Curated annotation (Swiss-Prot):
A motif (PPPSP motif D) lies at residues 1590-1595. A motif (PPPSP motif C) lies at residues 1573-1580. Residues 31-287 are annotated as: Beta-propeller 1. This is Low-density lipoprotein receptor-related protein 5. It comes from Mus musculus (Mouse).
Length: 1614
């Protein structure tokens, strides 16, 4: 059957036409008007019209399914399953637009019915499995049925008798009846029923009609299901909806896409009303007779009901009802003001509330936007706010219960907010952050933020409060899982439980009983303990695969389960268990609350306890707290902003202490600090800077701990000293490990090495920007204090008779230096020239850190564990500031007076392009190391000639003969096991191969990082780059691959071009491109035979330069100017050179080379690196003389590359520099200065000699010539010793004969059994030479002289060409008791063999002598091909439509065949749509709506799965215009449950080359598979690898990059 043409929908009719149609209904019409849904629109058609054309009522719809009307108002209602909405329009209003009636809580509203008397809408939802009712405007919505429903569909009303009817096509198909108020539910039809789709009531005859799409009938029965009769049977294809008028039934059919009619009594008089519809769905007769008016008890005063008045079949024939979740008061008329006990639920992208007052547990979505990944949720019963955390938005937000008033409270310095808790008494909000590993608090409005706990937290999760007792409890699921307790101010912290815990996710307090409950997602238990830590016991441990959210209200504990996708509850005493919600994905936290009940109080409830900011009730007293940056006054209630304060480092923390009051030590909430050492600040930006000698970084943050960032993170070893130049906005530091003093801008830019010579263990730094001096101490063999200009020049020793001077500080007012001496245990001072030395304090146990402010000096003492102060001139009035401190490294006073003054750099950076460096009386402009300053413009130019060398985790730059700057580590992120490096001098990109088998690139300042190749992006995941080289002219990168043993080429923009060289035995490794001459040189590490080869850049013209004197050549470099090739052999430990042609081989160096791994040429020198000796050395490249060590003590060396400037003239002169020489792929410079275009091996050059295209479509038994006039030759001619291709490519790269083949003298290989068979098979007849030799002992000699194995004799198969091995077999056969069967087959066998030989000879003569050789001009292939490769597209069709046929002019040659499609011809459509295949598993919240079904009973009534539809043209899938989404996302019964969050710990190795292995799946939802269970967090910090999949609901839709979602909970990725 051909597909009926789909007509474009007509334009909407003029409003006047609808008015005329509607008004025509007022008088009795001769034929009814049919209202039907057509997916994309709702239409009207006159069933008795002449033209039978439909009129559009509503257009531009997504997926209109069910439809009904209210005749008295002219209103039309319909459901849209794509928009998940119920909508309305009017027939009698000009230009009426569609209105939304119900837009939330719907998933698949399949059925719709209008109660025209009670003015209600009823509908079914086959996904939520509910039947609901609401007023016609959508208000007072109520769920009537939610249990024992399984795919409800059609619904019909009989308001006169108070009944509703519906069909259910689930596991137990049936038709049910109930009162319209939800009472007297009864099954009336449950036999001989399969897919009951359509349903309608004959109000006049009191009959019920329904259509069954599977059994293909229309039946009727009495309204109680009795007296069932057939109306139409057997001849229906796929009836969907039906209605009636008078004696006529009307129905829609999915397969015919038509509306049909018949007599309702007999089923006869069938006719087609309207055909060629887009997709006819529900249908109604738009007539007054279908909605007769009558009086009901609800007419007057809504029956006395406050909300819903629903008709009923029982006296008084109506019932009052309340909206979902609200209880009816005892008077039976009035509803309560709202739900009292509510379960608040956080899902991934929405919040929901579930009333616990009513048994339906319907979840209602809060209308709050921009929820991306909600985690935890809580509620404030006083103000009615819902609070939640969102770890994708990185914020804490709140809104009212109805979704209004949404606010963002906290969205700065918050990484992964997890648990949340409301202190409804003190009006504070607590939360845990598993990213920053903190517990913090604010006021409920988001102000007065303070960190309470920041130490010894690993993965804090749930948090609950006990305001009455002043305690808080939280869980930590880190390496040492535990449940802890502390006061509400974070003090008096102690561990409550730390044994037999895995992932304690949920936590709940029973305030009345004094008990603490928790759920563990790893041990799969719910446990309880007294709040004092006693009497621990297990409440539940059955079928708890992965608890996450957890809460308690009254007698019940509620929890969410990630794997079961359910919300359940258990009685806390009886342990009885119920399921609240089942099969709802993306479940996170939940909170059960009584929305109006406030429990408990404390002194903070009265005037905030007298506190100005935060009030904390604790078990001992009420305490006031201050937000970050404020200090508490001596009244212990008021917080102020301090004028000055002390800041000090103490290993992993940085603290601030008030100078005014004691006991005010506050840890600055900084993340990622390991071992802070030096400390300074920038008062103008309120920044604090510190060095970390463990992380080897310099970092900064605001004084409140926010915006932590690394300023310097490369090339540091032990940065012990640091100082901020607050005028020039520069940062200075001293590195004891590298023996350098460096400077950079405050953001880390323009880094310059200032001093690196004659430094011996530099330590503390101090700056005097006003005077232009820098001061530092040295701890080397001769300790001293040194001064220099701030540009690093004019160094001089100020103090030389000193011990280990530490923490140098300056009194800017009195112009004096202060320092601590660790050897003499004194604090000393001098003037700024090192003179007038005086001891300020002596006999100190161990003074270390030092600072000065006003009239005092402040110092730390490691032995006393204290901070003290004293008079700065006399050392008197010593005062203890703080005790009980360990290892305070540095100390300073944060105050503006410490950073005052002016110099030239304050204004416009001194007009300098990069660095403005103060010097006495002025300033000097400076540049980043290796950059050159232009004195006139004061701008800096990057270096053009330099060396790059790589280590395992770093790439450095150096200029060998530059005495002004040493080598510098480049700020390149993510370097891991760097193997090879290269550089593009045009675009200034560094390229490297890393340990993850990627080729990456970035600018030398670390910007614009990108990846050229990776296992996940490449065509083959088995790629392992070894070496790389760049052709700067054609903008391509060549690289060798260890895994595939190929040479590949990429464009520098990242596009892969393909393979240029591969061979069966090739193992190319080191590579060097000589683009100026069009060649590449490479080492070929074949088994036991290393070679150095040369080839053209397209892999052709291969030439072996050297095969001897090589063992393991590891690196190559080309010097084009000198015309030399250099290489180093790691096993022979020598460096050699030769001409580019391979001549004049010369050994340059072979002494004291231990482990060479790379070499390069720069200027007059040849450089190499030696990994074992940790050195970079060089010699003169022509003679090998003047060997010099360039750099020493460089560990883990891996590569070296020289960069020289390429002039514009030199570049422009290259033939490939302009537009790649016009080539589409590879451009090669020829000797005459012109370009030659070529292609990778999988493509061929087309006739225009510029463009590469697919190879010619030679048949599988043919060989494709690379270039030339001839495209295809028979495969047998390949490697036969006679070149047939014009370019002789058929004789290139011929394989070595296998063990079962005989090698002919001219290279041809023939079957070994054809050797000495009496007939020449080699072209040179060498297989028949020397055939008189004696056969081996285990061989049989044929009559022809051929030798075959003895075991092949008499095996019933002729192995000798003359068949002599099968002769005389019966004579030589051992005696047997069996009677031999008579056979006379020997003669015919010999005849057949001889015939075959004759035919073969004829064929050979025909092919070789008589037949004209094929040339491209006479072939059927497109002659635009000039070259080719032996690959044939699967669906090639020769030009002219011919798919096969002999070569023209060659009648005796083979035909050229191409593969043909098995699917069908053009325009065919698939039998099903994979996107909507029945039973397809999806993990999306919007589409995962299945439940775990028992074994299959019925396939769903869908065109996609109905066998009767497989041979038709219309399928309801997104593949054809019929629909963009199936009307019903059918789910096959018995399929697996929807996918769950990826539940494996994925550990990504830095250097692994293996692919991901397939996952295993849960067979039992009640057990975890240790040790690889799903981690209990949406964002695990342990998963940092770029290819890893975070095991959380956050990955439920994507399952990490391109991998498909698993069809069930996964437990292992091993």
């Amino acid at each position: 059957m051909e597909t009926a043409p789909t007509r474009a929908p007509p334009p909407p009719p003029p409003p006047l036409l609808l008015l005329v149609l509607y008004c025509s209904l007022v008088p009795a019409a001769a034929s009814p008007l049919l209202l039907f849904a057509n997916r994309r629109d709702v239409r009207l058609v006159d069933a008795g019209g002449v033209k039978l054309e439909s009129t559009i009522v509503a257009s531009g719809l997504e997926d209109a399914a069910a439809v009904d009307f209210q005749f008295s108002k002219g209103a039309v209602y319909w459901t849209d399953v794509s928009e998940e909405a119920i909508k309305q329009t009017y027939l009698n209003q000009t230009g009426a637009a569609a209105q939304n009636i119900v837009i939330s809580g719907l998933v698949s509203p399949d059925g719709l019915a209008c109660d025209w008397v009670g003015k209600k809408l009823y509908w079914t939802d086959s996904e939520t499995n509910r039947i609901e009712v609401a007023n016609l405007n959508g208000t007072s919505r109520k769920v009537l049925f939610w249990q024992d429903l399984d795919q409800p569909r059609a619904i019909a009303l009989d308001p006169a008798h108070g009944y509703m009817y519906w069909t259910d096509w689930g596991e137990a198909p049936r038709i049910e009846r109930a009162g319209m108020d939800g009472s007297t539910r009864k099954i009336i039809v449950d036999s001989d029923i399969y897919w009951p789709n359509g349903l309608t009531i004959d109000l006049e005859e009191q009959k019920l009609y329904w259509a069954d799409a599977k059994l293909s009938f229309i039946h009727r029965a009495n309204l109680d299901g009795s007296f069932r009769q057939k109306v139409v049977e057997g001849s229906l294809t796929h009836p969907f909806a039906l209605t009636l008028s008078g004696d006529t039934l009307y129905w829609t059919d999915w397969q015919t896409r038509s509306i049909h009619a018949c007599n309702k009594w007999t089923g006869e008089q069938r006719k087609e009303i309207l055909s060629a519809l887009y997709s006819p769905m529900d249908i109604q007769v738009l007539s007054q007779e279908r909605q007769p008016p009558f009086h009901t008890p609800c007419e007057e005063d809504n029956g006395g009901c406050s909300h819903l008045c629903l008709l009923s079949p029982r006296e008084p024939f109506y019932s009052c009802a309340c909206p979902t979740g609200v209880q009816l008061q005892d008077n039976g008329k009035t509803c309560k003001t709202g739900a009292e006990e509510v379960l608040l639920l956080a899902r991934r992208t929405d919040l929901r509330r579930i009333s616990l007052d009513t048994p339906d547990f319907t979840d209602i979505v809060l209308q709050v936007g921009d929820i991306r990944h909600a985690i935890a949720i809580d509620y404030d019963p006083l103000e009615g706010y819902v609070y939640w955390t969102d770890d994708e938005v990185r914020a804490i937000r709140r809104a009212y219960l109805d979704g209004s008033g949404a606010q963002t409270l906290v969205n700065t310095e918050i990484n992964d907010p997890d648990g949340i808790a409301v202190d409804w008494v003190a009006r504070n909000l607590y939360w845990t952050d598993t990213g920053t590993d903190r517990i913090e608090v604010t006021r409920l409005n988001g102000t007065s933020r303070k960190i309470l706990v920041s130490e010894d937290l690993d993965e804090p999760r749930a948090i609950v409060l006990h305001p009455v007792m002043g305690l808080m409890y939280w869980t930590d699921w880190g390496e040492n899982p535990k449940i802890e307790c502390a006061n509400l101010d974070g003090r008096d912290r102690h561990v409550l439980v730390n044994t037999s815990l895995g992932w304690p996710n949920g936590l709940a307090l029973d305030l009345q009983e004094g008990k603490l409950y928790w759920g563990d997602a790893k041990t799969d238990k719910i446990e309880v303990i007294n709040i004092d830590g006693t009497k621990r016991k297990t409440l539940l441990e059955d079928k708890l695969p992965h608890i996450f959210g957890f809460t308690l209200l009254g007698d019940f504990i509620y929890w969410t389960d990630w794997q079961r996708r359910s919300i359940e509850r258990v009685h806390k005493v009886k342990a009885s268990r119920d399921v609240i919600i089942d099969q709802l994905p993306d479940l996170m936290g939940l909170k059960a609350v009584n929305v109006a009940k406030v429990v408990g109080t404390n002194p903070c409830a009265d005037g905030n306890g007298g506190c100005s900011h935060l009030c904390f009730f604790t078990p001992r007293a009420t305490k006031c707290g201050c937000p970050i940056g404020l200090e508490l006054l001596s009244d212990m209630k008021t917080c102020i902003i301090p004028e000055a304060f002390l800041v000090f480092t103490s290993r992993a923390t940085i603290h601030r202490i008030s100078l005014e009051t004691n006991n005010n030590d506050v840890a600055i909430p900084l993340t990622g600090v390991k071992e802070a050492s030096a400390l300074d600040f920038d008062v103008s930006n309120n920044h604090i800077y510190w060095t970390d000698v463990s992380l080897k970084t310099i970092s900064r943050a605001f004084m409140n701990g926010s915006s932590v960032e690394h300023v310097i993170e490369f090339g540091l070893d032990y940065p012990e000293g640091m100082a901020v130049d607050w005028m020039g906005k520069n940062l200075y530091w001293a590195d004891t490990g590298t023996n350098r003093i460096e400077v950079a801008r405050l953001d880390g830019q323009f880094r310059q090495v200032l001093v690196w010579r004659d430094l011996d263990n530099p330590r503390s730094l101090a700056l005097d920007p006003t005077k232009g001096y820098i001061y530092w101490t040295e701890w080397g063999g001769k300790p001293r204090i040194v001064r220099a200009f701030m540009d690093g020049t004019n160094c001089m020793t100020l103090v030389d008779k000193v011990g280990r001077a530490n923490d140098l500080t300056i009194d800017y007012a009195d112009q004096r230096l202060y320092w601590t001496d660790l050897d003499t245990n004194m604090i000393e001072s001098s003037n700024m020239l090192g003179q007038e030395r005086m001891v300020i304090a002596d006999d100190l146990p161990y003074p270390f850190g030092l600072t000065q402010y006003s009239d005092y000096i402040y110092w730390t003492d490691w032995n006393l564990h204290s901070i003290e102060r004293a008079d700065k001139t006399s050392g008197r009035n010593r005062t203890l500031i703080q005790g009980h401190l360990d290892f305070v490294m540095d100390i300073l006073v944060f105050h503006s007076s410490r950073q005052d003054g002016l110099n030239d750099c304050v204004h416009s950076n001194g007009q300098c392009g990069q660095l403005c460096l103060a010097i006495p009386g002025g300033h000097r402009c400076g540049c980043a190391s290796h950059y050159t300053l232009d004195p006139s413009s004061r701008n800096c130019s990057p270096p053009s000639t330099f060396l790059l060398f790589s280590q395992k985790f770093a790439i450095s730059r150096m200029i060998p003969d530059d005495q002004l700057s040493p080598d510098l580590v480049l700020p390149l992120h993510g370097l891991r096991n760097v193997k090879a490096i290269n550089y593009d001098p045009l675009d200034k990109f560094i390229y490297w191969v890393d340990g993850r088998q990627n080729i990456k690139r970035a600018k030398d300042d670390g910007t614009q990082p990108s990846m050229l190749t990776s296992p996940s992006q490449s065509l083959s995941p088995d790629r392992q780059p070894h070496d790389l080289s760049i052709d700067i002219y054609s903008r391509t990168l060549f690289w060798t691959c260890e895994a595939t043993n190929t040479i590949n080429v990429h464009r520098l923009d990242g596009d892969a071009m393909g393979v240029v060289l591969r061979g069966d035995r090739d193992k190319p490794r080191a590579i060097a491109v000589n683009a100026e001459r069009g060649y590449m040189y490479f080492t070929n590490m074949q088994d036991h035979a290393a070679k150095i080869e040369r080839a053209s850049l397209d892999g052709t013209e291969r030439e072996v330069l050297f095969t001897t004197g090589l063992i393991r050549p590891v690196a190559l470099v080309v010097d084009n100017a000198l015309g030399k090739l250099f290489w180093v052999d790691a096993d022979l430990k020598r460096i050699e050179s030769c001409d580019l042609s391979g001549a004049n081989r010369l050994t340059l160096e072979d002494a004291n080379i231990v482990q060479p791994v790379g070499l390069t040429v720069l200027g007059r020198h040849l450089y190499w690196i030696d990994r074992q000796q940790q050195m970079i050395e060089r010699v003169e490249k022509t003679t090998g003389d003047k060997r010099t060590r360039v750099q020493g003590r460089v560990t883990h060396l891996t590569g070296i590359h020289a960069v020289e400037e390429v002039s514009l003239e030199e570049f422009s002169a290259h033939p490939c520099a302009r537009d790649n020489g016009g080539c589409s792929h590879i451009c090669i410079a020829k000797g005459d200065g012109t370009p030659r275009c070529s292609c990778p091996v999988h493509l061929v050059l087309l006739q225009n000699l510029l463009t590469c295209g697919e190879p010619p479509t030679c048949s599988p038994d043919q060989f494709a010539c690379t270039t030339g006039e001839i495209d295809c030759i028979p495969g047998a001619w390949r490697c036969d010793g006679f070149p047939e291709c014009a370019d002789q490519s058929d004789e290139e790269g011929c394989p070595v004969c296998s063990a079962s083949q005989f090698p002919c003298a001219r290279g041809q290989c023939v079957d070994l059994r054809l050797r000495c068979d009496g007939e020449a098979d080699c072209q040179d007849r060498s297989d028949e030479a020397n055939c008189d030799a004696v056969c081996l002992p285990n061989q049989f000699r044929c009559t022809s002289g051929q030798c075959v194995l003895i075991k092949q004799q008499c095996d019933s198969f002729p192995d000798c060409a003359d068949g002599s091995d099968e002769l005389m077999c019966e004579i030589n056969k051992p005696p047997s008791d069996d009677i031999p069967a008579h056979s006379s087959a020997i003669g015919p066998v010999i005849g057949i063999i001889l015939s075959l030989f004759v035919m073969g000879g004829v064929y050979f003569v025909c092919q070789r002598v008589m037949c004209q050789r094929y040339t491209g001009a006479s072939g059927p292939f497109p002659h635009e091909y000039v070259g080719g490769a032996p690959h044939v597209p699967l669906n090639f069709i020769a030009p002219g439509g011919s798919q096969h046929g002999p070569f023209p002019g060659i009648p005796c040659s083979k035909s050229v065949m191409s593969s043909m499609s098995l699917v069908g011809g053009r325009g065919s459509v698939p039998l099903y749509d994979r996107n909507h295949v029945t039973g397809a598993s999806s993990s999306s919240s919007s589409s995962t709506k299945a439940t775990l079904y028992p074994p299959i009973l019925n396939p769903p009534p869908s065109p996609a799965t109905d066998p009767s539809l497989y041979n038709v043209d219309v399928f309801y899938s997104s593949g054809i215009p019929a629909t963009a989404r199936p009307y019903r996302p059918y789910v096959i019964r018995g399929m697996a449950p929807p996918t769950t969050p990826c539940s494996t710990d994925v550990c990504d190795s830095d250097y692994s080359t293996s692919r991901w292995k397939s996952s295993k799946y849960y067979l039992d939802l009640n057990s975890d598979s240790d040790p690889y269970p799903p981690p209990p967090t949406p964002h695990s910090q342990y998963l940092s690898a770029e290819d890893s999949c975070p095991p959380s609901p956050g990955t439920e839709r994507s399952y990490c990059h391109l991998f498909p979602p698993p069809p069930s909970p996964c437990t292992d990725s091993s």
